[in-house]
Amino acid sequence: LLGIFCAGRFDSRVTGVDADENVLPYMELHADVNNVKIAGEKRTFQQLSVDYLSQFDVVVGADICFWDEMAGMLFNLTHRAVKAGVKQIMIADPCRPPFSDLSERCQKRYGDNAEVEAMWLSRPVRASGEILIVKP
């Protein structure tokens, strides 16, 4: 959904990626409902190579760090994205422990080039979370 928002709001060229091929038709449906075009691909985090990532300027993810082992996978993905020349990596999460681990690891590795922004919403529902932003 984040990529669909970016396609609509910023007129971005978006490739949506999910490890579960059953998600792709829903992604296409959401894109159609929002009158945007996106490409969809079935890939795991590990399949996003330096070569593959080199075609993107920005990598975004939301609500993708929910299992303990995902912190390591996303840390490695962030490192590959940096090596690929991606200009900005942003990952949003409601602050689950694996995300906090990922954020700490990125801040240690990338120093001032990694920051965490806290966000709060009061409408349409009360919610809070953080966004990890890495700008190599």
PLM region descriptions:
Residues L1-P136:
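S-adenosylmethionine-dependent methyltransferases
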